[in-house]
Amino acid sequence: MKSKIITFVLAAIALTALPLFAQEFGHSWVRIMALALLYVLLALGLNIVVGYAGLLDLGYVAFYAVGAYMYALLASPHLFETFEWIAQLFPGGLHASFLIVVPLAAGLAAITGVLLGMPVLKLRGDYLAIVTLGFGEIIRVFLNNLEHPVNITNGPRGLDRIDAMHVGGFSLGKGIEIGGYEIPSVTLYYYMFLGLVVFSVVICHRLEVSRIGRAWMAIREDETAAKAMGINTRNMKLLAFAMGATFGGVSGTMFAAFQGFVSPESFSLMESIMIVAMVVLGGIGHLPGVILGAVLLAALPEVLRHVAGPLQHMTGGRLDAAILRQLLIASAMIGIMLLRPRGLWPSPEHGKAAPTATGN
């Protein structure tokens, strides 16, 4: 117990000091770390659906989009320019605070998750994956075309001029100065994302060891046996979709505030596949593994961006740097699955053989 406390304290100090050290090399590195934390939040949410309940969801990015567009519509002037009656109701604009938009995004995403879950309750495996994949694409196409006859999402042009996140009347879009040391906006976002990740890890851990978590895992292993044991598989599946969706909705809200711009292309099928890959490559159903997978796959493209340039130079410029980077990412993912088929950090219980009974 004492060693766990020491490890936790050291990790907290390291994660707190990391952006302060990284910003000396440029704010872009802090930005990469902040985005990596957002992907950790997304991976934790998908792990509830895929890792705990065993429901393969390839349309998880839809909940990410719901949260992002909800915040973008509330925090940008687009709605006020489109609907005059909204501008008259709120002449000063809607500048909702963190404590309002986060529960709102979580609730809206949860409702969307239940709406997705209800038609697919009897589907499993490949069929469920295909249906959820289609759902994710429907949301993206819907956002891409919802500019006629009334311009709500601004179509493929997206929504810009989105307000920074407000916490207690303070805008994270501006840096602060403490004791003569300036902490820029991107570092403040990093700390907010870190706090959300820590809170989410606690929630996921409590769910994992709770009766709900055990019910999800029973459904994952054998749904028929779970029904025989009296588990309401219908409600448990809907709860898994709703709980996982809340993480996606909150992540989308943070993404919109952080970027200041959203468009349908930010929520493509490739984004969904990357989130699934984070969960699977890290160690499906295992919180430390999921976090590791999310951090590595979120940071790897940016790190390889610096490697692809020299490699392009070595080939005499015959290969495009972007293609080289994608090739390196794909090679790394294939290598991980070949060397670690159960993930980089799999659950210790996974695949453990039951003890053999011995007679006297």
Language-model region placement:
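Transmembrane alpha-helices and adjacent helix-loop boundaries
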Residues: M1-N360
